[in-house]
Swiss-Prot record:
Residues 1-30, 58-128 are annotated as: Disordered. Belongs to the PDCD4 family. It is found in: Nucleus; Cytoplasm. InterPro entries: ARM-type_fold, Initiation_fac_eIF4g_MI, PDCD4. Residues 163-284, 326-449 form the MI domain. GO terms for biological process: apoptotic process; BMP signaling pathway; cellular response to lipopolysaccharide; epithelial to mesenchymal transition involved in cardiac fibroblast development; negative regulation of apoptotic process; negative regulation of cytokine production involved in inflammatory response; negative regulation of DNA-templated transcription; negative regulation of JUN kinase activity. This is Programmed cell death protein 4. Polyubiquitinated, leading to its proteasomal degradation. Rapidly degraded in response to mitogens. Phosphorylation of the phosphodegron promotes interaction with BTRC and proteasomal degradation. Induction: Up-regulated by apoptotic inducers. Binds EIF4A1 via both MI domains. A motif (Nuclear localization signal) lies at residues 58-64, 448-454. GO terms for cellular component: cytoplasm; cytosol; nucleus. Gene3D superfamilies: 1.25.40.180.
Length: 469
């Protein structure tokens, strides 16, 4: 407070001669008995005193404002304000001292980039500037001969057995989805397989044994394309040796593993990635029953191929790669075999083996056609049970079921030419399917029906017309 009062007196000095005009003179302060002579408008405070009080209050506000603004910069008035006021020099924090100050008034810039050299902030030199290759100075005290002509190369550590299986399993599973052997070859080149190259066919065949026929066909193509680029024929032979050795364990998860491995061996010999004498080298030296069964299967297939059968047909073409005519024949044979054996689970298994879920409407269509063409009740009942089983197991979806019925509805006029009672049989079969929950009410109502023709002698209601003559 003493500093502030001292600043107020120095900034706004008052005349000592006019002290008598203030609120209290020196005598009144000591004695307190002398009256004030100057009275204006009935007030006991002089006009000059009021003006001085206003000036002092304004100076205080200005000083307090400047002090709070510059408190963060270490140049507050509390530190050096008293010396500046005594010396009569305007402090930098005062308005007069800040006129030539180029710093921001608000403590922030205008948002413009700083000039960090040519080009401004965040710019690497002037536009068009070309950087030369840094040359090593031989006379530099820190010069090292090893710094010249250095070639850097990424070193990939070889995979161990655990990392090998964890890395290659997703690659092969993705290959079963896209079927691009070149992509698999590029990914394997980026890995340092080392001595684990022979493990690639072992892992691929092991995964294919648990998959479908199309997966096994894709695995055979993959082995044929990788041989010579990623692995050699010796690696392929080592891999099949390990497969024959591990057959007892593989047969626990896949009972058909010996026959399937034999087919892989026959296909590999046919593709030229295994030598023709590979099977002969095992004659008389195999004690394992599963390995002997695999070699016998391969021998039979190779002997059949010599008679003219292509080795490419070991697995067949599965999935959507099969022609439509072939699929129609397979479904027709499937239904006829089911009518003879009555084995519903085998029919469902054969349908899944075709791997054509987008073509299941053909089975619905062919099944209903067989019902319309049959003369007994056995086909009617068996086909109804088959469709009901396939529907409950979600083997045939609602879209495929609907499409099969719609095909029958559209072709029933042509079918009726060969089967006169097809309309009545179809109405009965559709009603039974609706009662079993196979089709919806909307699909049932779409079933076409042909009304019975009235004879000329029949009137309305089936009565005979009276004679008009």
């Amino acid at each position: 407070m003493d500093v502030e009062n001292e600043q107020i007196l120095n900034v706004n000095p008052t005349d000592p001669d006019n002290l008598s005009d203030s609120l209290f003179s020196g005598d009144e302060e000591n004695a307190g008995t002398e009256e004030i002579k100057n009275e204006i408008n009935g007030n006991w405070i002089s006009a000059s005193t009021i003006n001085e009080a206003r000036i002092n209050a304004k100076a205080k506000r200005r000083l307090r404002k400047n002090s709070s603004r510059d408190s963060g910069r270490g140049d507050s008035v509390s530190d050096n304000g008293s010396e500046a006021v005594r010396s009569g020099v305007a402090v930098p924090t005062s308005p007069k001292g800040r006129l030539l100050d180029r710093r921001s008034r608000s403590g922030k810039g205008r948002g413009l980039p700083k000039k960090g050299g040519a080009g401004g902030k965040g710019v690497w030199g002037t536009p068009g500037q070309v950087y030369d290759v840094e040359e090593v100075d031989v006379k530099d005290p820190n010069y090292d001969d090893d710094q010249e002509n250095c070639v850097y190369e990424t070193v990939v550590l070889p995979l161990d057995e655990t990392a090998f299986e964890k890395t290659l399993t997703p690659i092969i599973q993705e290959y079963f989805e896209h079927g691009d052997t070149n992509e698999v070859a590029e990914m394997l080149r980026d890995l340092n397989l080392g001595e684990m190259k022979s493990g690639v066919p072992v892992l691929a065949v092991s995964l294919a044994l648990e998959g479908k026929a199309s997966h096994r066909e894709m695995t055979s193509k993959l082995l044929s394309d990788l041989c010579g680029t990623v692995m050699s024929t010796n690696d392929v032979e080592k891999s099949f040796d390990k497969l024959l050795k591990d057959l007892p364990e593989l047969a626990l998860d896949t009972p058909r593993a010996p026959q399937l491995v034999g087919q892989f061996i026959a296909r590999a010999v046919g593709d030229g990635i295994l030598c023709n004498t590979y099977i002969d080298s095992y004659k008389g030296t195999v004690d394992c029953v599963q390995a002997r069964a695999a070699l016998d299967k391969a021998t039979v297939l190779l002997s059949m191929s010599k008679g003219g059968k292509r080795k490419d047909s070991v697995w067949g073409s599965g999935g959507g790669q099969q022609p439509v005519n072939h699929l129609v024949k397979e479904i027709d044979m499937l239904l006829k075999e089911y009518l003879l054996s009555g084995d519903m689970s085998e029919a469902e298994h054969c349908l899944k083996e075709l791997e054509v879920p987008h073509f299941h409407h053909e089975l619905v269509y062919e099944a209903i056609v067989m019902v319309l063409e049959s003369t007994g009740e056995s086909a009617f009942k068996m086909m109804l049970d088959l469709l009901k089983s396939l529907w409950k197991s979600s083997t045939i979806t609602i879209d495929q079921m609907k499409r099969g019925y719609e095909r029958i509805y559209n072709e029933i006029p042509d079918i009726n030419l060969d089967v006169p009672h097809s309309y009545s049989v179809l109405e009965r079969f559709v009603e039974e399917c609706f009662q079993a929950g196979i089709i919806s009410k909307q699909l049932r109502d779409l079933c076409p029906s042909r009304g019975r023709k009235r004879f000329v002698s029949e009137g309305d209601g089936g009565r005979l017309k009276p004679e008009s003559y």
